[in-house]
Design a protein with these regions (language model features):
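Helix-to-loop junction immediately C-terminal to a conserved catalytic motif
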Residues: 15
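Conserved ABC transporter NBD signature motif
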Residues: 23-31
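Conserved ABC ATPase "signature" region
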Residues: 31, 76-91
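ABC ATPase NBD coupling module
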Residues: 32-49
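Conserved ABC ATPase signature
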Residues: 95-105
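Conserved catalytic motifs of ABC-family nucleotide-binding domains
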Residues: 116
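Catalytic Walker B motif of ABC-type/P-loop ATPase nucleotide-binding domains
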Residues: 120-123
Length: 171
């Protein structure tokens, strides 16, 4: 859908980052309104991965540390596998403030996928990427979702990626 139609708000509601003003949201037998903030945070950390429109990388950490900080197992082979798969090996020790946008985007994707989430929420994951990098990012997200049997919820106005998905809801 177009900018401003509520795509990000919908993702934030479904993931428990925002509380609905009416109605309720449930995931895996948990009703969000019955959970306290700590329980919602634990539900998110244990089940959800996020690729935010604004990447929210930690500027005083390097690329690898930004991925590791999200990992529930700091020595995980998954960190190394994602670094390799996403072509981040050459920049893993580079401070994120010195990365290009495409490199930063790939670090954010790796951070999202490091815990093999049950649900991947991707808010404009190809924003600012050229065709080649957009395809790499979408291919990786789809491959990881299939590998881990994750559900994938993508909000975008990028028409280039619409055909990658079997179910599309237009807003």
């Amino acid at each position: 859908g177009p900018s401003g139609c509520g795509k990000t708000t919908l993702i934030n509601l479904l993931s428990g980052l925002l509380k609905p003003t009416s109605g309720d949201i449930a995931f895996a037998n948990y009703i969000y309104s019955e959970l306290n903030e700590v329980e919602i945070d634990n539900l998110r950390f244990s089940n959800f991965g996020f690729i935010f429109q604004k990447l929210h990388l930690i500027g005083h950490l390097n690329a690898k540390q930004n991925i590791q900080i999200a990992s529930n197992n700091k020595n995980s082979l998954n960190v190394e596998n994602l670094i390799q798969t996403l072509g981040l090996k050459a920049i893993e020790n580079k401070m994120v403030k010195n990365l290009s946008f495409g490199e930063s985007q790939r670090v954010a994707v790796a951070r999202c996928l490091v815990n093999s989430p049950k649900v991947i929420f991707a808010d404009e994951p190809t924003s600012g990427l050229d065709d080649s990098n957009a395809k790499i990012v979408i291919d990786l997200i789809l491959k990881q979702a299939k590998k881990t049997e994750s559900s994938l919820i993508v909000s975008t106005h990028d028409q280039r990626i619409k055909n990658f998905f079997s179910d599309v809801l237009e807003m």
